[in-house]
UniProtKB/Swiss-Prot annotation:
Protein name: Ribosome-recycling factor
GO cellular component term of the entry, any: cytoplasm
CDD domains in the record: RRF (cd00520)
Subcellular location: Cytoplasm
PANTHER family reported in the protein's UniProt record: MITOCHONDRIAL RIBOSOME RECYCLING FACTOR PSEUDO 1, RIBOSOME RECYCLING FACTOR
Alphabetized InterPro entries for the sequence: Ribosome_recyc_fac, Ribosome_recyc_fac_dom, RRF_sf
Keywords: Cytoplasm, Protein biosynthesis
Main location as per UniProt: cytoplasm
Amino acid sequence: MPDIKAIQADARERMGKAIEALENNLSVLRTGRANPGILKKVMVEYYGSSMPIDQVASITTPDARTLVITPWDRGALNPIEKAIRDSDLGLNPNNKGDTIFISLPMLTEERRKDLVKNAKNYAEEARVAIRSIRKHALDEVKKVEGVGDDEIKRAEAEVQKITDEYIKRVEDTFHKKEQEILG
């Protein structure tokens, strides 16, 4: 049977993973500045298997509005171009023979609002995950045997304090991304 400290440490670790998942989800949202992270979820069909674009090419940002994709094998050029074109990112790759250039257009106000809405949804998913972890931790604390009611109450208060800390991190992460998107 785990002790109270172990339950709290486990909750903290799992809440940290929820924050990491939020940051990963937010990193693929386009902000108007070139960021190789927006291509993170693009999968390239190459030699009969599907793999992330960063495993078949290097992605650089020569300026704030351009991405340059240089495949490690020229045979991957067309599959990379097709994967980017078929993605839901709304990007138009320009194949230059040995590299692919992507000029990022200015975001329209409507597109910015959509991106903020997506970011808000990701933040809500993280909040729900953190609350679920809190509920699990509180249930585990109540099951600990040989501990007085006062100790249980203190442990529950500590779990709530940890939860509040991670919910605040979700809010801060969301607001930072919102500011990036809205420019």
